[in-house]
């Protein structure tokens, strides 16, 4: 999950998707993080409990990792059973690009906010002003470069050049765009 590959499908299917913090789930020996750390490994599960169990069995440092999670004993399953502390939750109900938000989506967000308030959490409206174009431009460089490196590695495994038929259209676009950039970009 770098841009929602776990969270988005889960949300569309009534499942649970979590993107753990960077360094929490090891990628495996001899493999660097995807997309310069934006991409994180985990799973889509039927419940928070199932995700907690999988975090318990898969989290932790690995030799050679450049990013280490906080050290200490963590029991995610036990943590899922404890009531959370009172939270201050930012409610951002506008579209990132200023596009209209469907009324059903607005109502789902409002309903969730009311539920969180009923559980004792504080809800505060938020509307951060973000340099969206700059953010997505930088992300495009990072994801494209990561894709380029991954496909060069794949070409070595295959013993031939990677072709458009080997990948999904969005990945081919990332790959083609990255080939136009220099390291200075």
Model-predicted segments: where are they?
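Structural signature of FAD isoalloxazine-binding scaffolds in flavoprotein oxidoreductases
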Residues: 7-12
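Short, hinge-like loop/turn segments at secondary-structure boundaries
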Residues: 13-17, 140-144
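A short helix-breaking turn/cap at a secondary-structure junction
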Residues: 19-112, 130, 153-161
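Short helix-loop capping/hinge segments that flank enzyme active sites or metal/cofactor-binding pockets
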Residues: 78-93, 142-185
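Conserved dinucleotide-binding and phosphotransfer motif residues
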Residues: 119
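General small-molecule cofactor/ligand-binding pocket signal
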Residues: 122-127
């Amino acid at each position: 999950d770098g841009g929602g590959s776990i969270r988005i499908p889960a949300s569309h299917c009534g499942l649970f998707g979590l993107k753990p913090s960077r360094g929490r789930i090891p990628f495996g020996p001899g493999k660097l993080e995807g997309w310069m750390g934006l991409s994180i490994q985990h799973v889509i599960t039927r419940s928070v409990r199932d995700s907690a169990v999988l975090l318990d069995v898969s989290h932790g440092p690995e030799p050679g990792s450049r990013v280490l999670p906080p050290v200490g004993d963590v029991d995610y399953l036990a943590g899922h059973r404890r009531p959370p502390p009172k939270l201050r939750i930012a409610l951002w109900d506008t579209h990132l690009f200023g596009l209209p938000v469907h009324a059903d989506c607005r109502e789902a967000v409002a309903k969730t906010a009311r539920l969180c308030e009923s559980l004792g959490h504080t809800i505060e409206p938020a509307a951060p002003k973000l340099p969206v174009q700059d953010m997505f431009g930088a992300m495009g460089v990072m994801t494209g470069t990561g894709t380029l490196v991954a496909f060069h590695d794949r070409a070595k495994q295959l013993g031939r050049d990677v072709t458009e038929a080997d990948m999904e259209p969005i990945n081919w676009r990332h790959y083609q765009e990255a080939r136009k950039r220099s390291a200075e970009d």
